[in-house]
Design a protein with these regions (language model features):
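Positively charged, solvent-exposed patches that mediate nucleic-acid binding
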Residues: 1-124
Length: 124
């Protein structure tokens, strides 16, 4: 399995995103991330992700983009365990990673937290 993040693995359907945040989804926090996920059958990929960094916390787009890049990279490297579990269960998930902190965080810390979050999703 390749370590790439394809376009179909990015969540961009407005209808699914609205459904995720309107209710019916599950969520938990692994500071500095809040993870919201929802089983959705109409996705093309087994897991599609959305990454959000608040403009209120980081005024500069450069910093927001850095955080998004760190989360995306951590997910890309560690997604295999999640994808294997989803293939076993024949389930598809929409996952949103929301960055909560107002401080920049090292990539190693974010990767550790993303691993923890993915493990918790696999448990449930």
């Amino acid at each position: 399995m390749a370590n790439t993040l394809h376009k179909v693995e990015r969540l961009d359907k407005k209808k699914i995103i609205e459904k995720m945040f309107a209710g019916g989804s599950r969520s938990f926090s692994v500071f500095p991330l809040r993870v919201v996920y929802l089983p959705v059958e109409e996705l093309e990929a087994d897991a599609s992700i959305l990454i959000s960094v608040s403009k209120r916390r980081f005024k500069r787009a450069v910093k927001r983009n850095r955080v998004k890049r760190q989360i995306r990279e951590a997910y890309r490297v560690n997604k295999h365990e999640l994808l294997n579990a989803l293939a076993e269960k024949k389930c598809r998930l929409a996952i949103a990673f929301i960055y909560l902190s107002d401080q920049l965080t090292e990539s190693s810390v974010i990767e550790e937290r993303v691993k923890t979050a993915l493990a918790r999703i696999v448990e449930r």
